[in-house]
């Protein structure tokens, strides 16, 4: 008598496609996934609890290590929360430097996603091109703050350092170069028949499902939901810039790809306008006490990171350390839909779907 048995298969925690210590336990029948269970926590460091014993400025380097592919947005959200509680007015030059740093970081983050996602499904050359352009951005950020990955650049009240001489001009020159390369990326990949067969119609979910799972970022917008905090709840100086919010319609891996690729172009628009409007002089840090004490009370702020809505809740009892600190980490929420997406899929689509969700494990585990 012929019989079949379901097999348990571990993907990770050490697996090249997970880009971090992430384990996925899948139950397969032949090549069809019957069940998928994410196992997280391998990179948990207790950031929120540690923060309760740190001064506010000391917390900033810890945020670098959550979403380490987009550290600038993490820096900003903690500073923004404290500034909101203190009612600080940020110098204009500092705001422009913050926006430039965050949008360059957004482009760099999407380049890592583009290159590694394609590498995982079998395309080697895009990975090399993506890291070539990312290296240029990392060099620009290195000139700005002296670090390549964990920047520790922003401060409550502004930024730590002003832009060095010639830096704005280098950023200005980078924009047309990156646009040219982006067109080349589309020629290389976006119309490729093999690639389209791997992503179109794969990993579909509806707008209602995306909202019920609390998805955000490109994982939400790919379903047609036009929601981006830079437009819908503008913070910093984003209301001064003219840019569009890319949205999809089907909610599959292809729509997620298109949304992120178009986001690179929109970030280039913001960078271009920020360079044109950049103040010629001015302070980069507001007058704040050396030891910052947030007033008693609570504050919650949220901003748009490359992976979605990152939020920061602070409860203060008036001391130099927060009484309670809580981050809303978008990768953690985006990951929750993965079991639904994988159920019933061919195992060959697993890596395509996982890469399309674009999680960072430092952010998932916290």
UniProtKB/Swiss-Prot annotation:
Mode of membrane association: Peripheral membrane protein
GO cellular component, one term: plasma membrane
Keyword flag Transport: yes
Subcellular location: Cell membrane
Keywords recorded for this protein, A-Z: Cell membrane, Membrane, NAD, Quinone, Translocase, Transport
Catalytically driven reaction(s): a quinone + NADH + 5 H(+)(in) = a quinol + NAD(+) + 4 H(+)(out)
GO MF: NAD binding; NADH:ubiquinone reductase (non-electrogenic) activity; quinone binding
SUPFAM superfamilies found in the cross-reference section: HydB/Nqo4-like (SSF56762)
EC numbers on record: 7.1.1.-
HAMAP family assigned to the protein according to its UniProt record, in alphabetical order: NDH1_NuoD
Quaternary structure note: NDH-1 is composed of 14 different subunits. Subunits NuoB, C, D, E, F, and G constitute the peripheral sector of the complex.
Family statement drawn from the similarity comment of this UniProt entry: Belongs to the complex I 49 kDa subunit family.
NCBIfam families: PRK06075.1 (NF004739), PRK12322.1 (NF008974)
Function field: NDH-1 shuttles electrons from NADH, via FMN and iron-sulfur (Fe-S) centers, to quinones in the respiratory chain. The immediate electron acceptor for the enzyme in this species is believed to be a menaquinone. Couples the redox reaction to proton translocation (for every two electrons transferred, four hydrogen ions are translocated across the cytoplasmic membrane), and thus conserves the redox energy in a proton gradient.
Name the UniProt record assigns to this protein: NADH-quinone oxidoreductase subunit D
């Amino acid at each position: 008598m012929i019989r079949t048995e379901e097999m348990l298969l571990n993907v990770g925690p050490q697996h090249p496609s997970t880009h971090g210590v992430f384990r996925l336990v899948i139950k397969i029948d032949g090549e069809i996934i019957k069940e998928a269970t994410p196992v997280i926590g391998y990179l948990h460091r207790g950031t929120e609890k540690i923060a309760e014993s740190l001064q506010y400025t000391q917390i900033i380097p810890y945020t670098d290590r959550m979403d380490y592919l987009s550290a600038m947005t993490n820096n900003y959200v903690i500073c923004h929360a404290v500034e909101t509680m203190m009612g600080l007015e940020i110098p204009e030059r500092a705001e422009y430097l913050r926006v430039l740093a965050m949008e360059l970081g957004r482009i760099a983050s999407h380049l890592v996603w583009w290159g590694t996602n394609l590498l995982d499904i079998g395309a080697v050359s895009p990975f090399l091109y993506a890291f070539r352009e990312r290296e240029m951005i990392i060099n620009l950020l290195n000139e700005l703050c002296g670090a390549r990955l964990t920047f520790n650049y922003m401060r409550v009240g502004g930024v730590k350092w002003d832009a060095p001489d010639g830096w704005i001009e280098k950023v200005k020159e980078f924009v047309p170069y990156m646009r040219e390369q982006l067109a080349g990326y589309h020629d290389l990949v976006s119309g490729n028949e093999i690639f389209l067969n791997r992503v179109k119609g794969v990993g579909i979910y509806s707008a209602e499902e995306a909202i019920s799972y609390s998805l955000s970022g490109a994982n939400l917008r790919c379903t047609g939901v036009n929601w981006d905090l830079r437009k819908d709840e503008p913070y910093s100086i984003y209301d001064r810039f003219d840019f569009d919010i890319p949205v999809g319609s089907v909610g599959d891996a292809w729509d997620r790809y298109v949304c992120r690729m178009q986001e690179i172009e929109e970030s280039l628009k913001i960078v271009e306008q920020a360079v044109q409007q950049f103040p010629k002089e001015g302070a980069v840090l507001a007058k704040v006490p050396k030891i910052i004490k947030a007033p008693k009370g609570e504050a919650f702020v949220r901003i748009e990171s490359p992976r979605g809505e990152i939020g920061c809740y602070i409860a203060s009892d008036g001391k130099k350390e927060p009484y309670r600190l809580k981050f809303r980490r978008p990768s953690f929420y985006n990951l929750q839909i993965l079991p639904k997406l994988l159920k019933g899929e061919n195992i060959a689509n697993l890596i395509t779907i996982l890469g399309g969700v674009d999680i960072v494990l430092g952010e998932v585990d916290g």
